[in-house]
Every structure is written in structure tokens, then in C-alpha cells.
From Swiss-Prot:
Biased composition (Polar residues): 369-379
Pfam family, one: GATA
Source organism phylogeny: Eukaryota, Fungi, Dikarya, Ascomycota, Saccharomycotina
Protein name (database record): Transcriptional regulatory protein GAT1
Subcellular location, record wording: Nucleus
GO biological process: negative regulation of transcription by RNA polymerase II; positive regulation of transcription by RNA polymerase II; regulation of nitrogen utilization
Function: Transcriptional regulator of nitrogen utilization required for nitrogen catabolite repression and utilization of isoleucine, tyrosine and tryptophan as nitrogen sources. Controls expression of the MEP2 ammonium permease, the DUR1,2 urea amidolyase, and the transcription factor STP1, which in turn mediates SAP2 expression, a long-known virulence attribute of C.albicans. Influences the filamentation process depending upon the nitrogen sources available. Required for virulence in a mouse systemic infection model.
Keyword Nucleotide-binding carried by entry: no
Length: 688
């Protein structure tokens, strides 16, 4: 009769719960026999259809009124009690020996509904004995008794149906031994605050009258009466009220799911008085559910149980289990499938829909510690507002190992793509062909990728300009010189395609120190005179070079170190022409035409010479103090141009131009005569 109670509508559909209507009819019949009762007030307060129906005030009024009119009610309730006991005995199979006391209360109008309830049972305890308790001579109805206990009106003059000294309870200790596991969790302790006398000891009682089938909250007693006898059976028999017959109005303060022998008494204990020789311990191996009408649950409660009332009836028909680890008809060792399948409607107030329940099943010492957790699906991560133009390279032959940084940019840390000679490994973002382009200037090659506040990728120049000035870098500042940052992948000198050096542009600091270093550095190499045909390996460095290392080499990872000097063989017999010319700066230029070579000794990559192994070059070295510059201008011979410039700050290589796809910024002879004015942009591209 309770399974149709709604769990989320506290006031709108109360009429679907027959308990409210039956209690109203019963209380109305009680109050009609009283002369001094304010009949209109109680009828209005008992009307469950009133929207502002106050349960607490209603209960208190009933309790106060029952305290004053207890004796008048007993005569009327005794006749109803006899009728109820006779009907109950027919339904449950127990004999009516006039020993029921006040088991049925005064709610005789709903005794016909007892057929919906199965025989009384205890899910984990088998009935063995039945102890008949004589009827108390001066008894009260359970309703009156509960109201008195609820309002703390436990007067010694008022007798209870359990205050007979001859009453005794035989407790089988085989099912009382406590175990180590507990299956409970706390709920809202502030739901309907009020007096609590469940565990208050009463004199001359074998056990507390309210501790057998009540909650820690005392408010449930006046609203819902028990329909099964409580006073004449032992625990081994079927005196434990079923979950469908004794409902708590308010969620108990300490537990909703409890492991107790009593379905509705998770923490009840027998007072150690009278003939009782042992306390009643909780059976932690059994799981019992306190059925609470959902329409009485407050929104502050932690858990609401929407649909498990349908399963309570099936639970009440479950055969008796012998295994202490098998609550209901299943064991928790099977993964909690029964509970997950039948009780998946446990929701929190903030949840719109029930979430799946997961069990952590790890039996320990033949006991189970099942932790019930309502798994809330984590909301997916918010989609980033950043618009990224990063596209993943689908070339599996390269198989790069990428790393996603915290900002979302993809950095290739290891790649099998190398240059044409197979030397070197791409180890930087400038070398990875990931398709990343600057959203401002559109460049795809930069020593350092940056991001704007929106998360879009920017090159180092645009990103640093935005960081320093706070505005977007104007495209007018972007010149063709910035394309010299690119490093070609087709050069045959073995240069690493991923080095982020600055060999094409010299910063002011390295240029200012050029004059301070006289010899042995990359800008002013000292000529080394050796025998003809001597082969220099790039792994063996000259003593002068090993002693001093220029600032330029520290900043740029100089491509000069990667020069394969083993390919350099200059013979004096092959020099066919030595001519001296004058450049625009009136500096002598000596062209050494290296003939007889079908292909240049350097392939496609010109570079500076740290040392020349030809005596012929050493003859003209005395006239040239500035760095030598080598250019492979044609395929039939190699033109080595040694250019002395008065503008030392404008020194650059043709390598910077030949790696470009359009060869912008280079003249026909391959010699760059650009001045320092073209290097004003360089401060944007330096790594500080």
C-alpha cells in the first residue's frame, strides 16, 4: 500500500498514500467521542489536502490531546483492537489467544489491506521459538503510546504494553554476533528536528518500547502505525516488522541503508534489564532498508529513494537466507547486481536523473565492505574557445612523437624526418612539418611558437611584439628578410633541419665583440697552412678554435661546425685564374676559379672557411683580414669569393638566400651586400 508514494512531490500527491487517509479516518473516529476536543481545529489540521499542512504541529496537537484524553480513548480503542487482532490472525496464521496487547493500534479500517502484506518475516533469521506475552491489563493503543513517547510524556502512571515484569524476549545469539562490516551512510541530521526518546530507558520495561522497530527520529510514530504484533514474539520468529508495514515518516538521522536485523530499527538495542541477558546488536551482515514515503522527504535530505518501494514487496517475499553475506536473494559477492539492477533510482537532490551505482566489492575475512557510491557522470571538459589551426600530419612514414603542451600546442620532440644526407634529427617546432602557421603574419617557420590570449598560434615575432607592446604586430613590419629564418631541408652539408640558430643574422652584441677577438673565432678565422691534400674532419677542431668560441657561435649553433671539411681539397694546379677586383667599398676581392670539378665540393651549401689547406690561399691571406666567403655559382666550377667589406656589420652569407624558395634578397653573384639597416627586425626573433 505504500509503493505508490511519490518521492519528489512532498505536498501535491499525498492522497495517493493510503496511510494518510486511513490515519485521518481513525483519528476522526477517536476524536468524535470527546466532548472537550476542539473538533473543528483537528479536522482542519488533519486534512491532508491542505497545501500548508504542517506535520509537526499536527503531531504535537495530537500528542497533547491524547495526554489529556487517554482514559477516554482506551475504551474505544479496545473494541477496535479486538477486531483488528481477529482479522490479523486470519491473515497471518497466528492464533488469537487474546494476548495481542495493543499490536494493531486503533487503525481497524485498514485491516482489510493486510492481505497485501506477506507473512511476517526476518530476512536473515529463521523462526525457531515463539514466546507468548500475556496481555497487559491496562494497555494503550500504539498510537496513543507513540504519541506520548513522542511528546516526552512518559509518565509512570501510564502503563505500556511491555511493562509487565513477566514479559521476556528470547534472543538467539547465533544471529546477534556483530560483524565488522557496516552498510550505511548518513543523511540529513536536521530533517524535522525534535525530541528523541528511542533509547531512553524506562523503568519496569524489559526493553524499550520504541527501540524495537523505530528510527532515531521519533516523528514517524504518530503518522504510521505498525500492523504486526511487537509484543509477543521473539526476534527469531516473525515479530520484526517488514519494510512494507512499518514506515518511518522522516528519514532517520543516522542512516538510510542500514545493516540491521530489524528492517526499521537500524540502531535499536534492547535495554539490558529484566530477563534479557544480552544486548541486541546490529546484524551488520544483513542489509535492511528503511522505507520512507518519498513525499515526506525534505529537499535538504542527502538521498531520496524513488522507486525501491516496488522492490520492497518482493523483498518481503524473499525466502530465508542461511548465508550472512547474502542480503535479499543475492550475495554482494556477485558484484551487487541485485542492488544495482533494482535500486538504481537513488538520487541526490541536485541530480536530475538517477545515476548508476557502483560497488567496491572486496571481501575481507568472510565479511564484505561494500562502499556504495553514487557515481555522477563527470561533465565533459568545456570546449576551449581557442581556435587552433594545428593539423596533425598523417604521414605515418615519418612517425613523429608529439607532445601536447599545457597550452594545447603540438611540439614534435622526436622525428624520423631528416635532411637529404640523413644526418641530424629534427628537434624543434621549426623543424616539424605540422602545418602550424601564424595567425597574424602567416609564417610557418619560427624558432618559438607563441599564443595570443585567445589561444591562437603566433610566431615568435608576432607573439613577442604582442607581449611587449600589447598590440598586434603590424604586417608592415614584416619584410622579406624574415624569410631568411627558414632553413632548407635539401642542403647536403649535414646541417640539422631543426636547429633554431641565427647564423644568417648577427645580433649587435656578437658584432660588437667581433673586433675584440683577433683570431680563432668564426668571424675572423686564422689561416692554417698545411700540406696539399690534407683532409680536415669536422670532428677534429683546430687548436685556435677550441681555445676560443665566439659569441656568434654561442647564439646560433653555427652552421660552420657542421661543415664537412673532408670534402675540401684545393690543389694549386687546379687554380687557373686569380684576379683582384674592387668592390663598392674599395675592398679587394680575389676570385679563385676552381676548375675541373663537375660538381662543387660543398654541394649546394656554401659556408665560411675556418681553415684553407692550400698554400695558394695562404699567399693572399696576408692581404685579406676579413672572413672568406665561398660561393658555388655554377656547376662546372666553384667560385670562391673572398670579400673584404668596410661595413663589417653587414656581413652575411649566400646560404641565407639560397635556402629560400624565391631567392629574394640575393643578387646574381650570390653575394649579399645588404647593410645593417635590413636587420632592424632581428630583435623580435631572438630568444631572450
Amino acid at each position: 500500500m505504500y509503493y505508490r508514494a511519490r518521492h519528489s512531490l512532498p505536498y501535491q500527491k499525498r492522497m495517493e498514500n493510503l496511510t494518510w487517509r486511513m490515519m485521518y479516518i481513525n483519528n476522526k473516529s477517536i476524536f468524535t467521542n470527546t466532548n472537550n476536543a476542539p473538533k473543528e481545529i483537528f479536522e482542519q489540521s488533519l486534512d491532508p489536502e491542505i497545501d500548508d499542512f504542517d506535520y509537526v504541529a499536527h503531531i504535537k496537537k495530537i500528542g497533547q490531546f491524547n495526554q489529556q484524553k487517554t482514559q477516554q480513548q482506551q475504551d474505544h480503542l479496545q473494541s477496535n483492537l479486538d477486531n483488528h487482532n481477529s482479522i490479523f490472525a486470519d491473515n497471518t496464521g497466528f492464533s488469537n489467544n487474546n494476548d495481542r496487547g495493543s499490536s494493531g493500534g486503533g487503525m481497524t479500517s485498514i485491516s482489510s489491506l493486510s492481505k497485501k502484506r506477506p507473512a511476517p518475516f526476518s530476512p536473515m533469521i529463521q523462526p525457531e521459538k515463539t514466546t507468548i506475552i500475556p496481555t497487559a491489563t491496562n494497555t494503550m493503543s500504539q498510537l496513543s503510546q507513540q504519541l506520548n513517547e513522542f511528546n516526552k510524556f512518559n509518565h509512570p502512571s501510564q502503563t505500556s504494553n511491555f511493562n509487565d515484569v513477566n514479559h521476556h524476549m528470547e534472543i538467539s545469539t547465533s544471529h546477534i554476533a556483530p560483524t565488522s562490516s557496516a552498510f550505511e551512510f548518513s543523511l540529513d541530521p536536521l530533517a524535522f528536528e525534535g525530541p528523541n526518546q528511542n533509547f531512553q530507558p524506562e523503568p519496569h520495561h524489559d526493553f524499550n518500547t520504541n527501540s524495537f522497530d523505530s528510527m532515531t527520529s521519533s516523528y514517524e510514530r504518530p503518522l504510521f502505525d505498525d500492523f504486526l504484533p511487537r509484543d509477543h514474539h521473539n526476534i527469531q520468529s516473525s515479530s520484526v516488522p517488514t519494510s512494507a508495514s512499518s514506515f518511518s515518516t522522516i528519514v532517520p538521522k543516522n542512516t538510510q541503508f542500514s545493516t540491521s536485523a530489524s528492517i526499521t530499527s537500524p540502531t535499536s538495542t534492547f535495554s539490558n534489564q529484566g530477563n534479557n541477558s544480552s544486548n541486541f546488536h546490529r546484524l551488520n551482515s544483513t542489509v535492511s532498508i528503511t522505507a520512507t514515503p518519498g513525499n515526506l522527504l525534505r529537499q535538504e535530505s542527502m538521498v531520496s529513494l524513488p522507486d525501491y518501494a516496488n522492490h520492497l514487496r518482493s523483498m518481503s517475499q524473499t525466502p530465508t537466507m542461511n548465508s550472512s553475506n547474502a542480503p535479499f536473494s543475492h550475495s554482494f559477492n556477485d558484484g551487487g547486481s541485485y542492488f544495482m539492477n533494482n535500486f538504481t533510482g537513488i538520487t541526490l537532490p541536485s541530480q536530475p536523473s538517477p545515476q548508476p551505482i557502483h560497488f567496491d566489492n572486496k571481501p575481507k575475512d568472510d565479511h564484505f565492505n561494500t562502499s556504495l557510491s553514487v557515481s555522477q557522470q563527470q561533465p565533459s571538459a568545456k570546449k576551449s574557445k581557442r581556435k587552433s589551426t594545428i593539423t596533425k600530419s598523417k604521414k605515418k612514414a615519418a612517425s613523429p612523437e608529439t607532445t601536447i603542451t599545457s597550452t594545447g600546442s603540438t611540439i614534435t620532440t622526436k622525428s624520423t624526418n631528416s635532411n637529404s644526407t640523413g644526418k641530424g634529427t629534427a628537434t624543434g617546432p621549426a623543424a616539424s612539418n605540422t602545418g602550424v602557421s601564424c595567425t597574424n603574419c602567416g609564417t610557418k617557420t619560427t624558432p618559438l611558437w607563441r599564443r595570443n590570449p585567445q589561444g591562437q598560434p603566433l610566431c615568435n615575432a608576432c607573439g613577442l611584439f604582442l607581449k611587449l607592446h600589447g598590440v598586434v604586430r603590424p604586417l608592415s613590419l614584416k619584410t622579406d628578410v624574415i624569410k631568411k629564418r627558414q632553413r632548407g631541408n635539401n642542403n647536403g652539408s649535414g646541417n640539422s633541419s631543426g636547429t633554431t640558430n641565427n647564423s644568417n643574422n648577427y645580433n649587435n652584441k656578437s658584432i660588437s665583440k667581433k673586433n675584440e677577438i683577433d683570431d680563432g673565432d668564426d668571424l675572423n678565422p686564422t689561416s692554417i697552412t698545411n700540406n696539399t691534400g690534407l683532409t680536415n674532419n669536422n670532428n677534429s677542431k683546430s687548436p685556435a678554435k677550441s681555445k676560443k668560441k665566439s659569441n656568434f657561435d654561442n647564439n646560433s649553433n653555427s652552421a660552420l661546425n657542421n661543415l664537412d671539411k673532408s670534402k675540401l681539397k684545393i690543389n694549386t694546379n687546379e687554380i687557373t685564374n686569380i684576379s683582384e677586383t674592387t668592390s663598392n667599398s674599395s675592398s679587394p676581392v680575389i676570385n679563385l676559379n676552381h676548375g675541373g670539378r663537375s660538381s662543387g665540393v660543398f654541394g649546394n651549401t656554401p659556408d665560411y672557411l675556418n681553415g684553407i689547406t692550400s698554400p695558394a690561399v695562404s699567399l693572399v691571406k696576408s692581404e685579406i683580414d676579413n672572413p672568406h666567403q665561398l660561393n658555388n655559382s655554377n656547376s662546372n666550377g666553384m667560385l670562391m669569393t673572398m670579400h673584404q667589406s668596410s661595413h663589417q656589420s653587414s656581413l652575411s652569407t649566400t646560404f641565407d638566400h639560397e635556402v629560400e624558395s624565391n631567392n629574394e634578397g640575393s643578387n646574381s653573384s650570390g653575394v649579399n651586400t645588404s647593410t645593417a639597416n635590413n636587420q632592424d627586425w632581428d630583435w623580435l626573433n631572438m630568444n631572450y
